[in-house]
Regions:
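Well-ordered alpha-helical segments embedded in enzymatic catalytic cores
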Residues: 16-19, 66, 124-127, 190-193
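Extracellular beta-strand ligand-recognition surfaces/modules
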Residues: 17-49
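Aromatic- and acidic-residue-enriched carbohydrate-binding clefts of CAZyme catalytic domains
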Residues: 87-125, 152-189, 195-197
Length: 197
């Protein structure tokens, strides 16, 4: 055990709990375990986030100090965010919604991504713009062009629709279409709202 803490849960309603884990030593590979002292019991977890106490410039929900300082030391003229495949998402219902990346962390809608892992959006547009200000870099926001990533699609969709060895078919099913034209005005407004933000 490298660090431990006890959190008393005193409500049946949703509530945010915080604790600080201070490591007794450095380790290369660690694992977080949440254990219930009272059994049998049921605990529903909404979001678990491990976050460093020391952030770049002491910002709440800021970037890891060592990584952010490394970027700052490069003196970039601009910083691009998020990456292209993250912005375009894994399917039309998964295009990166910038409005879902601001506000309290626990209220941000998490995303699945093309690489098969969960993205909490702990780093959202607010943190991105603030970091750009902190290092005097121009922000270069990346937004989807109204279509999902060309590599998007679930594996079951590929397996169900592509005969073995049919590469053209596989490529065809990777693209899932774009935002319907009747929904495009709302999408364009979201883009304009980001410019105003």
């Amino acid at each position: 055990v490298c660090a431990e803490s006890v959190v008393k849960v005193a409500s049946r309603e949703w509530k945010k709990y915080k604790t600080v884990l201070t490591a007794a030593s450095a380790i290369d590979k660690g694992r977080l375990e949440l254990l219930l002292e009272s059994v049998p019991a049921t605990l529903h977890l909404d979001m678990v986030s491990l976050f460093p106490q020391n952030t770049f410039k002491g910002r709440e929900n800021g970037l890891r100090a060592d990584l952010a300082q490394t970027l700052a030391d490069l003196h970039p003229r601009f910083i691009r965010f998020p990456g292209g495949c993250v912005a375009h998402g894994d399917g039309i219902d998964n295009i990166y919604d910038w409005k879902g990346s601001v506000g309290p962390l626990e209220a941000r809608k998490p995303l699945r991504n093309l690489w098969g892992y969960h993205q909490t959006r702990g780093l959202g547009y607010f943190e991105y713009f603030r970091f750009c200000e902190d290092i005097d870099a121009e922000p270069l926001p990346v937004l989807a062009a109204g279509v999902p990533c060309q590599n998007s699609g679930t594996h079951s969709h590929y397996a169900d629709n592509c005969p073995q060895g049919a590469n053209k078919e596989l490529m065809r099913y990777g693209q899932q279409g774009g935002i319907p034209m009747e929904e495009m005005p709302a999408y364009i407004q979201d883009v304009l709202d980001l410019i105003e933000y």
